[in-house]
Regions:
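Hydrophobic membrane-insertion alpha-helices, especially the h-region
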Residues: 8-22
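Ser/Thr/Pro/Gly-rich low-complexity linker/stalk segments immediately outside membranes or between
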Residues: 25-42, 50-53
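Hinge/beta->alpha junction and helix N-cap segments in small-molecule ligand-binding domains
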Residues: 39-47, 68-78, 136-146, 166-182, ...
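Short, polar/charged alpha-helical segment
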Residues: 48-66
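Extracytoplasmic/secreted envelope proteins and their assembly/folding machinery
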Residues: 52, 56, 80-84, 88, ...
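Hydrophobic alpha-helical
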Residues: 96-117, 183, 199-225
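Flexible loop/hinge segments that line or gate small-molecule binding clefts
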Residues: 104-142
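Hydrophobic alpha-helical segments within soluble ligand-binding/sensing domains
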Residues: 134-161
């Protein structure tokens, strides 16, 4: 799966570069130092290291005061709203946000009004399609599709008669929905069976969950646990 690792590394590098460009563009005027709050679910997770380091470097170059909010898992729009409100009380000028799961998140973010913000890693979830917010993200559908293509190509029988288990992040997120859709399209018509799909709920012991769900020929994990 070396190619898939490269795909994810390229996606992470893309996020770092574009998020840095956002900081440069939004505050390029000659004004006093601005404050930007970064809200990421479980901000201490190592998966954010590259992104945070890139943002810090860009903030330093552009004389921006970057605030990395200390967070646990953000499971709802209300969780995220509390973090946003706290930073607004601290007079931040803009936000970089990984949107919370759930269909209420888009409406909550819309209430920010004139406060600048950009979404990263995924769009806000909506059954109607794109939210319309400024979003910096990889092509989550294509990532899922590429994973499906690789599994199919590496299986001697082209997946015919094989079983697959899918593990995603929270169900009501654009990243999970798009990634799963891409995977399903890639394996369509192969004759394989999707035995189960598990979406994150809280902070489970994923090994115990997998033991309960049962054995499959291939397991596709589309989020960090």
């Amino acid at each position: 799966m070396k190619k898939s690792k490269i795909t994810f590394l390229i996606a992470e590098l893309f996020l770092v570069v574009i998020a840095g460009f956002f900081i440069h563009q939004i505050f390029r005027e000659d004004v006093p130092q601005k404050r930007v709050a970064v809200i990421l679910s479980n901000s201490g997770d190592k998966r954010w290291d590259g992104l945070i380091n890139g943002l810090k470097q860009s903030a330093n170059v552009n004389d921006v005061h970057l605030i990395i909010c200390n967070t646990d898992d953000i499971e709802s729009a209300q969780d995220e709203k509390e973090l946003i409100d706290e930073q607004l009380e601290n007079d931040v000028d803009a936000f970089i946000i990984c949107p919370a799961p759930g269909e209420d998140t888009s409406d909550m973010l819309g209430q920010l009004g004139d406060v600048p913000f950009v979404l990263i890693t995924q769009d806000a979830y909506s059954e109607d399609g794109a939210s319309g917010f400024v979003t910096i993200k990889p092509d989550n559908y294509k990532i899922g599709y590429t994973l499906g293509e690789q599994i199919r190509a590496n299986d001697a029988d082209g997946l015919r008669g094989k079983s697959i288990g899918i593990i995603t992040g929270y169900s009501q997120t654009e990243g999970s929905v798009s990634g799963k859709a891409g995977l399903m399209d890639a394996i369509e018509g192969t004759g394989c069976e999707v035995s189960w799909v598990y979406s994150r709920c809280g902070n489970p012991n994923i090994c115990d969950i997998v033991d309960i769900l049962g054995k499959v020929d291939y397991m596709v994990v589309m989020d960090t646990y």
